[in-house]
Each structure stands twice: as C-alpha cells, then as structure tokens.
Amino acid sequence: KPELRYKAARQGLQELGHETTLSYLGEAARLVFEESDLLPHLNPGLMTAEDFQALRPVSASMGIMLESVSDRLMEKGEAHHGSPDKIPARRLETLRLAGEATVPFTSGLLIGIGETRLERVESLLALRRLHDEHGHIQEVIIQNFRAKPETKMAAALEPDLEELLWTIAVARILFGPEMSIQAPPNLSPGVLTRIVEAGINDWGGVSPLTPDFVNPEAPWPHLDHLARETEEAGKLLIERLTVYPRYALEGE
C-alpha cells in the first residue's frame, strides 16, 4: 500500500483524515454509493478479511487480477521481481477471502509477461477451483500485455494474437458457458470479431467519458464502432451493471 512506502502518501492521507488508502477508498465509495446513481467497483489490491467486511457494504463488486500463479515470475529478471503484492499465494489468498465474504469478484490473467502456456492453464485452474468452492467469480479477464515506455519492460515483446485467442479459448473450455470471459477491446483493435469467436462474451468497462488509465495509449473504441464489430461477430452489444444479475439477487 502507498502509505507503507511513501511519506507523501501518509501525509496526504492524514490531511484527508485517514490512516490508510483503504479507509479513504471506503469513504469515497460510500459517497458514490449513497449520493449518486453509480455503483462502485473496487480494485485496491491485496485485502484482508477485515478489509472485505469494511468495503462490502459500500460497493457492488470488487476485483484483483491474479495475472499468473507462476512463482518463477518472481525471480530476478522476470516480470514480477521486486513486487511482493504480486506473489501468487498472496493474490490467491485475497481471492479466497473474497469468496468467504461472498463478494462478487473479478479476476483474470495477464498474458505475455514471460509465462508459458502451461502456466496459463494452471492459473485458470486455480481460479476455477476457487470459484467451484465459493461461487463468487463473476468474470475472468484475459488481458494481453502492452509494453509501456520508461518501464523495465518497455522493450519486452508483446504477445501475438494467436496467444490471446488460444488463452481465451482455453478459458472458455475450462469455465464452460456459464462464466463471463472478457478481453479489453482497446488492446486488440481490428481483430475484435476474432476475439468474440475465440470465446469471450464481455468487453468489460468501456467508457465514452474517461480514458483507460492503465493503458492510456490505447483509446477506447467508439461505442457505435464496437456495436458494429460485435454485430459482425453475431452478437449484440448491451449495457450491464458492474454486478451481474444473479449476484445482485443473492446480495444482502
């Protein structure tokens, strides 16, 4: 968490009347939940059982990307080296606690960061086991890595389309027709029909108002264009809430 590493973050939080980022997030989510027509979706990273207990009443859903279960990626020179919050066991524990707290949850894989196809299958199976036990995973994202300037992986090769399509297809096979499988449309322009044909049924959050803050170099497709591409693949583009219907009906 930022307050554990940066003095400026601690000072900023204190000025806002909070000791932790998650406390501040909880207040912001409560204001959105109570004073607007929006439903908060929270993605604050690793969480404890107490964190879920505090945030569940002020959010409709939450999420954390598993990315990969490969401990090998934590080694020096690999994508997750020096990132303790990306230790697979810690992310899996957050996913497990989300299930125990009955939080409608989003997770998924980041492909093309040095993992093998076998490691992708192992990651998908880990998510499947957690979902089989708790039934809380609403959607599984298959996100392709995009290299960013001025980062340690700026020169890293990005995964090709076939790797993305293969992983989507395997996710659909492993999770069956009931699970929502998602891929960001702004990261694969020009091939959206092939992505649908591979097995997705959801584009995720696509905003006409804000950029993709994680991938600002990749603008969202215009909704009219996305609707046409979706129709060409034999599907319809419709809006949905951050919480899926059956989870909304099961909510307290």
Protein language model annotation of sequence segments:
Residues 1-132:
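Conserved Radical SAM active-site core
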Residues 11, 31-36, 121-252:
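Auxiliary Fe-S-binding modules of radical SAM enzymes
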